[in-house]
């Protein structure tokens, strides 16, 4: 079981997201908690670095993405660092 943390700056953005994107995000977070941060079954999943991952929550225009980071040293802790449109994603 993994621990998923949503920082305050990300949590403040959640109500502004479309309902469909919010539902997709919460489904993704449940999967990360249960199965870990590598989510190859999600659309356009990609490993951005050794600790940073991302996937698309909604295709089309605008595309919404989620970016999360895992902590090194074997601690099962994941922090969501961005949820929003593809254009502003911190790649």
State each model region's role.
Residues 31-59:
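A short, surface-exposed loop/turn module that caps and links secondary-structure elements
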Residues 1-3, 12-16, 20-23, 27, ...:
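Enriched for short, Lys/Arg-rich terminal
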